[in-house]
């Protein structure tokens, strides 16, 4: 990796991505570290998606979806909250900062809230030490690879 931060943001189509789109139309700049991934619903984002993003080089992952209780797919965002909590516990169990995985909620009409969430995630990741990678000599090197492998993913 080139030393630049990389954050993958899984954004639901109905709210978070709509808020991101509106903020882009208003020419509000997002940190260059953030890569948006459009998903139909945050309920479709599983633990393996989050762990694979980290194993493939992301320094942090965020899931951004509808306000709790207002998911367009009924309970998708509640499922996402549970999955993010699971991944945070898993990361902590292998010696990786759980702050690298976070969940944010907003409505489509809240572009400033989306921008604030992305900037907050960027600030948090910037304050953390670099994520150990496979080839590093740190004790937690390859921890995300180990976490992914422990879930039966090659």
Language model segments and positions:
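Iron-sulfur-associated redox domains of electron-transfer enzymes in respiratory
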Residues: 1-154
């Amino acid at each position: 990796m080139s030393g630049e931060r990389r954050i993958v943001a899984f954004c639901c189509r109905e709210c978070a991505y709509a808020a991101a789109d509106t903020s882009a139309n208003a020419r509000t700049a997002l940190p260059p570290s953030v890569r948006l991934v459009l998903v139909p619903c945050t309920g479709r984002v599983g633990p393996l998606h989050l762990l694979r993003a980290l194993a493939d080089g992301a320094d942090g992952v965020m899931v951004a979806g509808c306000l709790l209780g207002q998911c367009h797919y009924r309970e998708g965002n509640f499922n996402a909250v549970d999955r993010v909590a699971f991944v945070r516990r898993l990361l902590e169990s292998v010696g990786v900062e759980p702050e690298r995985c976070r969940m944010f909620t907003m409505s489509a009409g809240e572009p400033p809230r989306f921008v604030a969430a992305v900037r907050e995630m960027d600030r948090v990741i910037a304050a953390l030490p670099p994520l150990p990678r496979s080839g590093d000599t740190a004790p937690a090197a390859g921890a995300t690879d180990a976490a992914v492998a422990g879930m039966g993913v090659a």
